[in-house]
C-alpha cells in the first residue's frame, strides 16, 4: 500500500473565477495527487508518495509558488534521487521557500 501525505493549502487566493478553474485543472493533472477535499479556507491534497516523480514534484513546486501556498511542506519529498536538483540547487526559485535560509 502506498504511503499518503496530506498537503494543506490555506487561504488560496484566486484572481478570477477562471484562475480558480485553472488551479483545479492543474491539480487534476498532477499524477501524484490522489484526491483532494476542503474545509472552510483549507484545501487538502492527498499525495500518493509512490507517484511523486521529479516531474510531479516540479509541478507541485510551480503550483505552490504560483498560488503562494506554504512550500515548506514540500521538504518531505526530498530524497537521494532528487537531492541534486531539489536541495543542492540553492539558486532555484523555490529553494528558500522550501528549505529556508542556511546560515554559515
Predicted feature residues:
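Short acidic amphipathic segments
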Residues: 27-39
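A generic structural motif
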Residues: 41-51
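Helix-rich interaction surfaces within compact, conserved domain-sized segments
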Residues: 49-104
